[in-house]
């Protein structure tokens, strides 16, 4: 760099350039000259000609000068003298200061020249040092970036690391370090959910730092500026377009490429997280934040009819919430529920995938806030299903928060019911599916038409049982309470003293404070007590119940609880009855199974067991039976096929078709003796008589497990009555809505106590008599019965809980009434 040396001039040389007068003005002191004239005029001037004394012009006229006193002239002279010397002093000082400043400027200029020389030499050294530092940074970045890849490539060849690994863990298998490192990373990413995000953040920081240092090494910007540019290249891949220089452009492109890779990875992680969240929602892994809902644990073929009944029950409140927890995929459950051909009527069904045996899954569906919990039986055999139900009840008891609702457990074997109640306590209500179906089949076999009555009462479409307290009826006797509800029919009383439910109490029972009334009504908000109507107590026929005649019943198949069905028949049938048992179980094994189940065959008084061995789907085996002589034929679901509903229903359907075909060919040879004895208590045109004479054949009752198959059989009219698991679903739904109803159902299903019966009209009225329904209810009380409905001769279905009970109606002897009566 050229050095510019300023030209130095001395003060003396510069003074030569000044004008002569100026030089003299600075070098010669100005001495004032005083001259006194006649006219007391003083003129003085040092160098200025204007201040010299003027020569008077003889031609000019003298100007008169005013006269002054001597003291004034002396004062004026001293003032002028003082001012003159002050000015001279100031000028001398100024000149001296100027000379001092000029000498100081000269010294500063010399020092400036020296400093410039030194700075030029140091800048050359700094440029060299900066160049060296950028080179060091560049090579450091390359080495530290390449070194990890080289170490990873030759990681397995590091013998000392292998030896160290063998010494520290000699028992483990010698695994390559690459695999071990990959395994450690995999475990870290799997165990710690935020490890991927932290790794991405670390990679971003490393890229920014390495890219910034590399950019600093190949450009002339500072470190802080390079780091900022590196971040902008990572965040925006197009911001490197204005880079100048080959090195800067290469580094910028590399940083931008790394930034695109990082952002692509980040988008992948975000997309993966969102996919997992959506997948969790789709698979039903999220938590259910509901309260006062009904929780269903498990999945079975009864779920469809169960949801239908719950939806109908919740219709009056605008719909409720039903949560289903099962070990199935959530999408599959929702797809199967969508296939059900019924309207949910505002009820929301929420499906969650999980196991009822896991407490975490139970908490996920808000088990503590559910108002009712239904435990469905599995599709396994009865013992496995009951064992699983027992484990579910144990899991429910392990919930620390507890549960405010009651639990309804579907059992398959009646013998396992006490064990579940022992584990769960008083809040457990059990519904034994096999027992319910078996008892209903027997009741329908002995009283044709009762199946439709039970479907109306158990289902929520028509009338069902409700229990409620009515303080305004305290002090009333049950005889008056019976006719106090225009839109309901009282059936019993829940005694406040001991909590027992008394069905069909005596007329003189007086309601006490706290007692609740059991009624049959359309809904819980559709009835209320009113004023007592006027009832006419006129004369009516008093007929005795017809005597029982021996029955001949055939069981096709072997059920699990067939011993309980035999006990019920023993209690209900007249002496001399026969029970034919046709199945594939050997005779000796049958007796052993019945004895092991607790049945003492030798103590059977009313029925006689007749054993026949054969296959119910083989025609020649069925032809060996006197099918035309049986009063009722019950086709039971085979115990050996209880794991497969489809196979069981197919077998029952094949047996039904074969029996009907054989009966049709033997029709001319049918002995009508037993049928004549059986229907002697009813008029010739009675509805019950027509049912008992269905197609002039024996009454055939089929047990069909799948409700869809049941609908097909009902439409084809090849069977008189079809009972399926739909009735069990109705019972589960009713007990879930009110657990007290379970005690009512158990008494009505039992062989002792009160039961549903169908009575002919001649028990209560004369032919063509015109009376209201209240009058008939009062007449039935003379027989200790409660009439809950009727079926007119021209109607297809019975009417339960008629609306206008005070309306006069003309009755016929062909009509029948549905009553609750004490079993004989």
Swiss-Prot record:
Subcellular location: Nucleus membrane
Main location: nucleus
Gene3D superfamilies the UniProt entry points to: NAD(P)-binding Rossmann-like Domain
Biological processes annotated in GO: monoatomic ion transmembrane transport
UniProt feature coiled coil, ranges: 325-346
Domain called RCK N-terminal: residue spans: 291-432, 550-699
Pfam families associated with the record: Castor_Poll_mid, Slo-like_RCK
Matching InterPro entries: CASTOR/POLLUX/SYM8-like, CASTOR/POLLUX/SYM8_dom, NAD(P)-bd_dom_sf, RCK_N
UniProt keywords, alphabetically: Coiled coil, Ion channel, Ion transport, Membrane, Nucleus, Transmembrane, Transmembrane helix, Transport
SUPFAM superfamilies in UniProt: NAD(P)-binding Rossmann-fold domains (SSF51735)
Transmembrane portions of the chain: 81-101, 135-155, 198-218, 250-270
Chain positions covered by the region annotation Disordered: 45-70
GO CC aspect terms: nuclear membrane
Compositionally biased region (Low complexity): 45-54
Topology class, membrane: Multi-pass membrane protein
Family in the record: Belongs to the castor/pollux (TC 1.A.1.23) family.
Additional facts recorded: The absence of an ortholog of CASTOR may explain the inability of Arabidopsis to form root symbioses with mycorrhizal fungi.
Protein's name in the database: Probable ion channel POLLUX
Organism annotation: Arabidopsis thaliana (Mouse-ear cress)
Lineage, highest ranks first: Eukaryota, Viridiplantae, Streptophyta, Embryophyta, Tracheophyta
